[in-house]
From Swiss-Prot:
This is Probable inactive peptidyl-prolyl cis-trans isomerase-like 6. Residues 147-310 form the PPIase cyclophilin-type domain. Probable inactive PPIase with no peptidyl-prolyl cis-trans isomerase activity. Gene3D superfamilies: Cyclophilin-like (2.40.100.10). It comes from the Eukaryota. It holds the Pfam family Pro_isomerase. It comes from Mus musculus. One of its GO terms (molecular function) is peptidyl-prolyl cis-trans isomerase activity. Belongs to the cyclophilin-type PPIase family. The gene is Ppil6.
Length: 313
């Protein structure tokens, strides 16, 4: 009888080496006021992280905003994120994979603790970088910039600064710009072609504020640098946000000197009124004008333009 063979232990299957997929690269996003040093610090750190770990980070998304746009962005984020963001006071927001990390200090601390990236650049260097960046940022727009210094009952409340889309509406922008400087002197009928000392004569709640009647300030007159009126140049700029600057008219091709600033998106003005600029600084000034008490849309306090002119030339 054959002897029974002892049971041999079953051989172990070869170890299975599972190759895990690589982690997706992180997305860094920096949104901030273009002329703040904290924005420049955050921008530099984000770019340094990408350079130091090219496969761990996507190219950072850098979003420079002018003051008015930054204030609008910050308000939207406060409503969206709530919590501690209600008291957020920095001029920059840093995001990792679309989640708020914090301000420049938070990004700097995270870069050092997690990635061993230490920023030792002096603050004086960042101030110089900020100035250079801001100058180039404005120059690259190829737009003109003007200001209106505002008073309520003769008390100064601040400055409104507008970006003029001279590439889209060159003739309309030139009219507004020259009326800000007063360099055209007087019209044939003796009107001083200057916004200085003119008033805001109308405030439409949730609509717009209106000024620029340089004749008598009643709101029924005005004059352009080209004559009493000039044509509608085009309707390419939409009324899609707060702070849009446009020309008042009495019908097609009747633009003069009167203008309006929207208080919210006003698509019903599209294709009827020529928008040609955007408020970029003066959030608190526009808010104060908006809150002036009125009677039949006429301000009960004197809202005047103490001075006006051109910036960044």
């Amino acid at each position: 009888m054959a002897t029974q063979q002892p049971c041999r232990p079953k051989s172990k299957p070869p170890a299975c080496h599972v190759r895990l997929p690589p982690e997706p690269p992180l997305k860094l996003k920096v949104v901030g006021l273009f002329k703040s040093s904290s924005f420049q610090v955050s921008k530099t750190i984000a770019e340094t992280l990408k350079t130091s770990y090219p496969y761990r980070f996507e190219d950072p998304v850098i979003v420079p905003l002018q003051e008015f746009a930054w204030d609008q962005f910050l308000e939207e984020k406060k409503r969206e994120l709530k919590g501690e963001t209600w008291v957020y006071s920095s001029y920059v927001m840093c995001f990792v994979n679309d989640q708020l990390l914090g301000n420049a200090f938070d990004l700097k601390k995270w870069a050092q603790k997690v990635w061993d990236v230490i920023d030792v650049r002096p603050s004086a260097l960042y101030e110089a970088l900020t100035l250079d960046y801001a100058t180039k940022f404005l120059k690259d727009t190829k737009h003109d910039f003007v200001y209106l210094d505002i008073c309520i009952d003769l008390s100064p409340i601040g400055r409104l600064i507008f970006e003029l889309y001279c590439d889209a509406c060159p003739r309309t922008c030139t009219n507004f710009q020259v009326l800000c400087t007063g360099t055209s002197g007087f019209s044939e009928r003796g009107t001083k072609l200057h916004y200085k000392d003119s008033i805001f004569h109308r405030v439409v709640q949730n609509g717009w504020i209106q000024g620029g009647d340089i004749v008598q300030g009643r709101g029924d007159d005005g004059e352009s640098i080209y004559g009493p009126t000039f044509e509608d140049e085009n309707f390419s700029i939409p009324h899609n946000k707060r702070g849009v600057l446009g020309m008042v008219n009495k019908g097609h091709h009747t633009n003069g000197s009167q203008f309006y600033i929207t208080l919210q998106a006003a698509p019903y003005l599209d294709k009827k009124y020529v928008a040609f600029g955007q408020l970029i600084e003066g959030t608190h000034v526009l808010k104060q004008l908006e809150l002036v008490p009125t009677e039949n849309e006429r301000p009960l306090l004197l809202c005047s333009i103490a001075d006006s002119g051109v910036l960044y030339t």
